[in-house]
Amino acid sequence: MVYQNIVAGRFVDRPNRFIAHVEINGVVETVHVKNTGRCRELLLPGVRVILEVAANPDRKTKYDLIAVYKQGFGLINMDSQAPNKVVAEWLAGQGYDVVKPEYKYGSSRIDFYMEKFRMDDGGQEVSERYLMEVKGCTLEIDGIGYFPDAPTERGIKHLKELAGAAGQGYHCIMAYVIQMEGINEVRPNITTHPAYGKAVEEAIAAGVKVLFLCTAVKENELRIVSGRYLGE
């Protein structure tokens, strides 16, 4: 995915989850933060941030904060809407016959439903069904990615839905889009949310596969370049 109109600024502060103050060309602007996570290790006073100019000129906030240069690391895309967009682009080239976003399953909406058609030994067409939930990883500690950066009961619910679906014959995938370069693994952040780590273990035991999606990150672009399943 490509951002159409970007500018750079310096982070000042973050009054709440939704907005931040950023100095752009010498003027402190109130901007929308496209990530409601904590991001405390990223948004430090004075760091260089990247913003997209809002398409609607009449919007109250004229900019979206989409990326940040982490001190001692490099550029990290922190747009929480980006992972699903880049996965949709990536899935289009993965040989699936059907790809449906926002698929209703059980009491949740799973990010993607996919199908692949094949012929069985008797010459009959059969469908392989897939469910994929997508999470974005922006937390890096000592060269390893971690998720989540804040407790997420919703994330646990999705893992349980995938585990149940695996028992019903679906191929279930928990995909982590790593929104930074140089990282190829994501571990459960049991320090922040021990229950999430347990839910991941239970999902894997039920047959859910964990997929790490590595990206190329530029100020105006995020793109998946490779994928690797846990254990490969």
Language-model features: where?
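Acidic-basic catalytic patches of nuclease active cores, encompassing PD-(D/E)XK
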Residues: 40, 71-101, 120
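Nucleic-acid nuclease catalytic cores
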Residues: 143-153, 163-192, 214
